[in-house]
Amino acid sequence: MTQANPRDLLQALFAAAVNAAQPEHCIPRFLPAPPKGRTLVIGAGKASAAMARVLEQHWPGELSGLVVTRYGYAVPCERIEIVEAAHPVPDAAGREAAGRMLALAQGLGPDDLVICLISGGGSALLPLPGEGVSLEDKQAINRALLKSGATIAEMNCVRRHLSAIKGGRLAAACHPARVLNLLISDVPGDNPMDIASGPTVADPTTCADALAIVRRYAIDLPAGARALLESGRGETVKPGDPRLAGVETHLIATPQMALEAAAEVARAAGVTPVLLGDSIEGEARDVGKVMAAIALQVKRHGQPVAAPCVLLSGGETTVTVRGNGRGGRNVEFLLALAVALDGAAGIHAVAGDTDGVDGLEEIAGALATPDTLSRAWARGIRPRDSLDNNDGHGFFEALGDSLVTGPTLTNVNDFRAILIR
């Protein structure tokens, strides 16, 4: 396949990574027996509606609940209510759903079970502001964080301390019921407190940590948000809190699982897979330059492995926005990679977000080929100018190389594959 059509193989690798994280493949084995009391289902994230549907299909007892997902990501459920809200910048629909979810958690008993279906995107989908913070404040802070270059862990630390539901608060509200967390990880390192900002797990970080991040990236906090952090009133639920004693957490799908699934497809095609890491962070364009150097070392010297091979990686890079183009971290990475490769023969690549959305575009990512730069120049497009303007989507769309999947109904972060023949 690699000799005939590298593009087909790269798309097959991406599809395998996404398929490995589909809820129907990873939820059933984690389900317990029904409890003596009620079963309440709550959740948030881009994959959470699909998770709810699978849970309904495999749950033998009664259940009810509420799950919030991104617009366009709802799927039909019979017993669990699905609500759609905005992502990545939150809206009133998400705020209302978060408030209702917190209310549903009240009054549960020790014989009840709460199943929490949490996946990436839940931070924006549960925007219940803390004391003195408005939804408009949270929207402004979220926009600033997204443009700042902060890591996802840093962004979520700030979000947790400005929230009335994140940072373990939702789990604390469920006490004394038993809480079962089923998490699909979209964050480097798979730390549960960073997945959807950890609404149902303890948080060891502090308001002081959040303030330090705000200062580091020069985020202009509204007065109410600053007061909440400086006073310590935004403190989260800490490890050892007795209200979380009945919480059990399982990571049911992770970026590493997705990479391993793609590696199997590569081996079947006669290509050696090299897994470089499932939690790579850093500026997207810098990561692109480093990956290009590794690919060129393989091509020129057969190190660390000989071609044909494919370099696989995951994680979540960042983009410090300086231009006004249509960008996203995956297309920023890929454009920087293409520029650094400078048309090197025999090297093709794909980069995409496994949820189908890179940045603010309904586009998962893109593909790059050895003639990417020459085709751009032929159309009057200057690749370095596009990179400087953070216009990765505009660049690859003009070449017909966008990767468009639609809603994938899962999310295990970014997927990158560099095929060297």
For each feature predicted by the language model, list its residue ranges.
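Internal helix-turn-beta structural module
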Residues: 334-421
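Active-site segments that bind and position negatively charged phosphate/pyrophosphate groups
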Residues: 270-351
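Accessory alpha-helical/coil subdomains and C-terminal extensions
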Residues: 177-180, 202-292
